[in-house]
Amino acid sequence: MRCPFCRHDDTQVVDSRVSEDGAAIRRRRRCPACDKRFTTYERVELALPSVVKKDGSRTEFDRRKIVASMQLALRKRPVAADAIDAAASRIEYQLLGSGEREVRSERLGELVMNELRALDTIAYVRFASVYRRFEDVSEFEDVIEEFRRTNAPPAAPAKPTRKR
């Protein structure tokens, strides 16, 4: 690696260790030409897909927007900030795992809804009402009914009957 001070082409690694969060390798380097030391960090470069909006325009994926929209839906709900962060990470991992270069904003909204559904029912309905642009109460009822249908507990097994 090139020295940032004297521009010498070859530096020596003096110390390497994993960063506290485990997401990077911290390296202390020394330049043999000027004898100065500096620190570098080695991280994995993740290429998240760009987002294709409804109007066809494209923008970079922004995790902060995902977190902000989830926080808004979860406002005054008993959900920890760590749970929101973990949900945003799961969305990122799903996008990375897809291998696609672009994701439609509609798909991103569905991923957020799925995460909110698992975190908090009220937040899920709140987000759905804005995301799907509800115009009347029947649309709320439809979402709630769908939620009840898909999240209904399994039916209790029938009790055996005795023969007399």
Curated annotation (Swiss-Prot):
* Keyword flag Disulfide bond: no
Alphabetical list of InterPro entries matching this protein = ATP-cone_dom, NrdR-like_N, RNR_NrdR-like
Cofactor section = Zn(2+)
Q: In which domain of life is the source organism classified?
A: Bacteria
**How many cofactor units bind, and how?**
Binds 1 zinc ion.
Cite the PROSITE patterns for this sequence.
Answer: ATP_CONE
For this protein, the record's Pfam families field holds: ATP-cone, Zn_ribbon_NrdR
Q: Where are the zinc fingers (unnamed)?
A: 3-34
Q: Which GO terms describe its biological process?
A: negative regulation of DNA-templated transcription
- Establish whether keyword Magnesium is in the entry: no
Q: Which residues cross the membrane?
A: none
* GO terms for MF: ATP binding; DNA binding; zinc ion binding
Which residues does the UniProt record annotate as the domain ATP-cone?
49-139
Q: Which UniProt keywords apply?
A: ATP-binding, DNA-binding, Metal-binding, Nucleotide-binding, Repressor, Transcription, Transcription regulation, Zinc, Zinc-finger
Family statement drawn from the similarity comment of this UniProt entry: Belongs to the NrdR family.
Read off the HAMAP family from this record.
NrdR (MF_00440)
Q: What is the protein's known function?
A: Negatively regulates transcription of bacterial ribonucleotide reductase nrd genes and operons by binding to NrdR-boxes.
Q: What protein name is recorded for this chain?
A: Transcriptional repressor NrdR
The source organism is Paraburkholderia phymatum (strain DSM 17167 / CIP 108236 / LMG 21445 / STM815)
